[in-house]
Every structure is written in structure tokens, then in C-alpha cells.
Amino acid sequence: LSDRAFAGSDTWATSYTIAQAIRKIGGVDLILFGKQASDGDTAQVGPGVATHLDTPQITYVRKLVAIDASTITAQRMLEEGNETIRASLPCVITVVKEINEPRLPSLKGKMNSKKAQITVWKASDIGADPQKCGLNGSPTKVIRIFTPAARSDGEILVGEPEETTAKLVDKLMPIIVGASN
């Protein structure tokens, strides 16, 4: 997918664009995404595509347990542990890095990749509404990108509990009182 119409896309417009391409392909049963992109780090595109396609989704997948003609069963990571979920196909899944150990391509694979024909679709090729792509279709707008000011090192209070508690209260009260005004 490459078109100036896609420029400035947020995750919602990106999800719409990818969903339109999947519709064009047709007959897709399983749509696989990484958990998140390294640029925005939002983990929203996979679930957004599922929303646009009105398909089930399983996020944070660490292991595929079973798949048949109509369902997929996957184990997903949660903060508290793992959860096994079954969903009907077609389905969107987002995977975490623990799902697989990537392997390096063979020399033959590298050579063959140089000959590969890459199909490029523009917005018109996938039937995308220009008002839903790129900056036009993005409900969020980047106003400013900046590097936050460096934070000072923390302070360690040393002494007896009563003494350090009093010091801590003295330091926090102006912040607390100032925040409530």
C-alpha cells in the first residue's frame, strides 16, 4: 500500500486502509499482526482492522493451540498469566515476540527475494474512501513532537522514620496544595 492519500494516517486511518486491502484480497481467514509497531507503539492497528472488518480478534497471542476450518484457539499473555481463547474464523490475531524464534533467510531465499514482484496498491485500487484515509480520515492530529525536558535525579531522604517523614511532608505539601488550587 503506497499512496500520498495515506500520508498523515493515525492508527484509525491506517486500520481502515489495511482493512480495505484485505477486503480486496477476499477470502482471508486469518489476519496476523505484530502486537505493536515500533514507531507509534500503540498496539491499536490490529484491533482497529478487526473493528473495520467486523471480525473477532485475539490480542497478545503467545501460542497458537489449534486451528481448523472454522475456529482458532490461541493462548494469550495477560499480566496475571495466560488465557486460552477460541474464536471463529475469519479472525485477527496480534502476536507477541514470544510466539516464535525468527530464523535468518537462506542465501537462496535472499537471492529469490531480489526477483520477487511486489504489487503496489493505491487508495483507488482498494476502493478506499479518500475522506477515510491519511490525514483526512484521522480523528487524531499530531500538534507537536518534542523531547521532554530532562528530569532531575531523585532525592534519597536519610534519617530516622519520624525525621524523614517530616522532610517528605515538607517537600510534598507545596506540590499537593499547588495542585489543588
Each language-model region and where it sits:
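N-terminal glycine-rich FAD/FM-binding segment characteristic of electron-transfer flavoproteins
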Residues: 1-181
